[in-house]
C-alpha cells in the first residue's frame, strides 16, 4: 500500500518573533487547525483522519511545518486541507481562548520535565535577551496579551510568498 506525506514549511519560527511576541509562532501553529471559512476545526480533522490519515504540525526556532499523511490516492485532498488551513485561518476568538489554555498546559508540562526545562534554561543562558533564548511555546505573560489582531498580523507578515 503506497502512502503520501505532504507538508507546508514556512521559514518562520520563534527566532522571527519580536520582543513581546514570544510564543506567537507556536500559538499560530495551533490556531491554523481551528477552522477556515470552509472548514470547522472538527471538519479539518475529520477530512484527514476519516481517510485513515494523520495531520499535525510543529514549530521550531527556524520554521513551522504543517504535515499530513494518508494513502497515496488521497494526496489532492491532503493538499487541499493543508492549503486551506495555511492560507485561510479564521482566528475565532473562542478558539483563541481555548488554545491559550492548551498552550499554558503544554508550558506547565515542559516545566515538569527536568530534561526539557534544562534545555530551555540553557538556551536562555546562551542567548540572553535574544529570540533564541526564549521558549518556543512562549510564556504566560505574552500568551495572555496575544489577541486575534496579533495572530492575524503575524500570519499576514510571515505566511506569504517568500517566507
What are these regions (language model features)?
Residues 41-163:
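Charge-rich, well-structured scaffold segments of protease-associated domains
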Amino acid at each position: 500500500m503506497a502512502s503520501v506525506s505532504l507538508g507546508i514549511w514556512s521559514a518562520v519560527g520563534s527566532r522571527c518573533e519580536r520582543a513581546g511576541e514570544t510564543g506567537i509562532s507556536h500559538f499560530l501553529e495551533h490556531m491554523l487547525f481551528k477552522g477556515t471559512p470552509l472548514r470547522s476545526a472538527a471538519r479539518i480533522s475529520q477530512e484527514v483522519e476519516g481517510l485513515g490519515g494523520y495531520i499535525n504540525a510543529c514549530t521550531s526556532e527556524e520554521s513551522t511545518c504543517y504535515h499530513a499523511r494518508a494513502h497515496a490516492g488521497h494526496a489532492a485532498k491532503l493538499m487541499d486541507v493543508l492549503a486551506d488551513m495555511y492560507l485561510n485561518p479564521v482566528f475565532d476568538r473562542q478558539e483563541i481562548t481555548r488554545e491559550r489554555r492548551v498552550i499554558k498546559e503544554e508550558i506547565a508540562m515542559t516545566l515538569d520535565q527536568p530534561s526539557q526545562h534544562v534545555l530551555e534554561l540553557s538556551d536562555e543562558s546562551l542567548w540572553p535577551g535574544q529570540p533564541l533564548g526564549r521558549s518556543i511555546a512562549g510564556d504566560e505573560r505574552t500568551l495572555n496579551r496575544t489577541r486575534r489582531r496579533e495572530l492575524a498580523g503575524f500570519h499576514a507578515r510571515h505566511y506569504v510568498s517568500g517566507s
